[in-house]
Amino acid sequence: MVTGADGFIGSHLTEALVRAGYDVRAFVLYNSFGSWGWLDRCEADVRNKFEVFAGDIRDPNGVRAAVKGCDAVLHLAALIAIPYSYHSPDTYVDTNIKGTLNIVQAARELGVQRVIHTSTSEVYGTARYVPITEDHPLQGQSPYSASKIGADQIAMSFYTSFATPVVILRPFNTYGPRQSARAVIPTIITQIAHGLRRIKLGALHPTRDFNYVSDTVAGFICALRSQTGIGEVVNLGSNFEISIGDAARAIAEVMGVEIELLSDKQRLRPDKSEVERLWADNSKARKLLDWQPQYGGLDGFRRGLSATVEWFKEPANLRSYRSDIYNL
């Protein structure tokens, strides 16, 4: 079962698992419109080849019903927008921490063979050293990252306390088709695609390690198949660092335009909350999971950007995004 299957990474993962021959149950957030999120637009060769369970990760009864009969759970469902976490932190505790507790509790009771829990590089806070290894100190610099630290600890506690077979994957900044406009790369692409040349962003100097979505998905599948990852925390990162400003300029180059970058006050994090530097050491993933990024380095980043830009430029896709508002 894939939780968060209606979201950005989850929809790509669901498609990849179906294509790899797995029987997949897709856990999507219940809504009165009957929408399956991005799964509504999945590729024709995948559509109708997975089972959908509509529920809420915060509800233990629904989660247990969804987990029943599954050999493995890939848990991606979460609230992830950092700005929204500043004014609605309770929802992050309920969804990210309690939701994870519901998953591992159901997995323990039902004898699930593998739980792959999704962490985030944000739990490291500003890097104290680079590249960042999995034993780097955890620093909750936003309510979001604090909630994910709590979720990680809950998941790992079930491994240490009850031998629940948990693997924690810690992706660095994933990007690609279908990503929310609240993320920096879609924000830049959609502003340019809508004809803007003065691009509004938050801070331009922080650095990030960007993962193309197919690399992140491959990491999940490697963790599902591997016999050596249980009880481990594993970074998924490209081992390539670039500033937000330079990433924006790389996007403009791919799109063949010249831009001016503006630091918009409302997009800035509080001073002590900004994560200044993230750069992954991915050697553990290479060794334990036999995983390696296909879009690493500057050349790989540009290839990933090109594929992402092409998707966003499709009119049917671009219509789903608004560049005239600040997306929390």
Name each model feature, range by range.
Residues 1-174, 303, 307-317, 321-322, ...:
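N-terminal Rossmann-like NAD(P)+-binding domain of SDR-like oxidoreductases, especially those catalyzing
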Residues 44-50, 135, 162-165, 189-200, ...:
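A short C-terminal helix-loop "cap" of Rossmann-like NAD(P)-dependent dehydrogenase/epimerase domains
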Residues 58, 87, 95-98, 135, ...:
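Residue-level signal for the nucleotide or nucleotide-sugar donor/cofactor binding architecture
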Residues 73, 216, 220, 236, ...:
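Non-catalytic, hydrophobic alpha-helical segments
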Residues 149, 174-187, 194-199, 213-214, ...:
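Glycine/proline-rich active-site loop of Rossmann-fold NAD(P)-dependent oxidoreductases
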Residues 150, 154, 158, 187-188, ...:
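Hydrophobic alpha-helix immediately C-terminal to the catalytic Tyr-X-X-X-Lys motif of short-chain
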Residues 203, 231-234, 243-248, 256-277, ...:
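C-terminal "lid/loop" region of Rossmann-like NAD(P)-dependent oxidoreductases
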Residues 213, 233, 268-296, 303, ...:
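Conserved C-terminal active-site "lid" loop/helix of NAD(P)H-dependent oxidoreductases
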